[in-house]
Regions:
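Alpha-helical interface subdomain recognition
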Residues: 1-74, 105, 109, 139, ...
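N-terminal glycine-rich flavin-associated loop
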Residues: 77-97, 123
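Short Gly/Pro-enriched turn/cap motifs at secondary-structure boundaries
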Residues: 80, 121-124, 149-151, 167, ...
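A short, Trp-centered hydrophobic/proline-enriched beta-strand micro-motif
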Residues: 109-117
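Flexible, small-/acidic-enriched active-site or ligand-binding loops
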Residues: 128, 180-207
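A structural signal for short hydrophobic beta-strand segments in well-ordered beta-sheet cores
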Residues: 131-134
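A short core secondary-structure module
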Residues: 143-186
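A short, charged helix-loop
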Residues: 199-227
Length: 397
């Protein structure tokens, strides 16, 4: 099992990223419109080389990148992560022609990607999706709807998962790369609690060909899961970044704000809550980084550890941000306050890329499977009799 600690160079890089996010990226984020793709912000991420670095990183470096950006500017973090989610399938499963077509624009921050998996009736149960890919002489026609899709409907292309074999469950899903200008493809933005762009995609006989297939036909579910398994710990890192931002603000506020003739930090009821916030944040951070390091090392038990990391980090971040709002009082409820923003932002990660309930199911399934395997192994291992004592010819106790 990986024992995790950061190298000094990694810690320094994280601080550089945080400063960069605060000074260079946050001003661009503040000029953007909530619920819309911020193309100037994406262009800046491309110019700074952060999008390119994301695609060349392992799970741990991705977590460091996302946490550091989230601590300084959640909009920048989200913009980067959504590009990664929509494009990682191309990086991992795309043909040379597909990579050449889409990756340069994404790396430069010019091309916007979307990851179109969820549907109105298939969120947590992704294997039950119903977007139909009906065979035609030249390929397929996509008919149906995707919902809760980040960057929709403004994305320039989407990685779309559709059912090519009815009744085959997760084994009958194919991944397609669908440009936004395909006939029959439309969409609508959704007005959501969280400020990043989310919308629907409607497919009315959208034509796709074999050149649009990502990976192999009927093997698209694996493409989706490979992407989500990489990104799941980093969702926890995003949550940790928000928790650290809320904790930083709370420590500063309670140290300078006076009540009853003394700083709030002198009140045990306050300081103990801050201590709890710090403890949960640090525990979540270590759990996330250890899961990511285990992924990079190819260790066993990664699905369980990744699920634990996402579950604990997102739930802890919700607690930390909520407590921070409480300790700041009414000022934190004003539109435009950092904590008002974090309060809206922190809720969604407990749902997307596998809700907390799904993570608990994964953890429990892995635990019971491991226990069953150990029991089966124990039953198959012959019991060895103790060696006889030559002096007594009796078994040694």
């Amino acid at each position: 099992m990986t024992a995790f600690s950061l190298e000094p160079e990694q810690t320094a890089w994280c601080e550089e990223l945080r400063t960069l996010a605060e000074e260079r990226l946050r001003p661009l984020a503040e000029k953007g419109e909530p619920g819309r793709v911020n193309r100037p912000l994406l262009a800046a991420l491309g110019e700074l080389g952060l999008l390119d670095r994301m695609f060349g990183s392992g799970a741990l470096e991705l977590c460091l990148l996302r946490e550091s950006l989230a601590r300084g500017c959640t909009e920048a973090e989200t913009a980067l992560a959504l590009q990664g989610l929509g494009t990682t399938p191309v990086v991992r499963a795309g043909t040379p022609a597909q990579r050449e077509r889409w990756l340069p624009g994404v790396r430069a921050g010019r091309t916007v990607a979307a990851f179109a998996l969820s549907e109105p009736g298939a969120g947590s149960d992704a294997g039950a999706l119903s977007l139909a890919a009906e065979p035609t002489p030249g390929g397929w026609r996509l008919t149906g709807e995707k919902c809760w899709i980040s960057n929709a409907p403004e994305a320039d292309f989407a990685t779309v998962f559709a059912r090519t074999t009815p009744g085959a469950g997760s084994r009958g899903i194919t991944a397609f790369l669908v440009p936004a200008d395909r006939p029959g493809l439309t969409g609508q933005p959704l007005d959501m609690l969280s400020p990043h762009p989310i919308g629907t995609l409607e497919f009315d006989g959208v034509p796709v060909t074999a050149d649009d297939v990502l990976g192999e036909p009927d093997r698209g579910f694996r493409v989706a899961m490979d992407t989500l398994n990489l990104f799941r710990p980093s969702v926890g890192a995003f949550a940790v970044g928000m928790a650290r931002a809320a904790l930083d603000a709370t420590v500063a506020h309670t140290a300078r704000r006076t009540a009853f003739g003394a700083p709030l930090s002198d009140l045990q009821a306050v300081s103990h809550q801050v201590a709890e916030m710090a403890t949960r944040t640090e525990a979540a951070r270590l759990l996330v980084f250890a899961a990511a390091a285990a992924y990079d090392a190819g260790e066993s038990g990664v699905p369980r550890r990744a699920a634990m990391a996402k579950l604990y980090a997102t739930e802890s971040a919700q607690y930390v941000v909520d407590t921070a709002v409480q300790l700041h009082g009414a000022r934190a409820l004003r539109r435009g306050h950092l904590l008002e923003h974090l309060y809206r932002e922190v809720r969604a990660p407990r749902i997307y890329e596998g809700a907390s309930e799904v993570q608990r199911a994964i953890i429990a399934k892995e635990l019971y499977a491991t226990a069953a395997a150990r029991q089966a192994e124990a039953r198959q291992t012959p019991v060895q009799e103790p060696a006889a004592d030559p002096r007594t010819q009796e078994p040694t106790v």
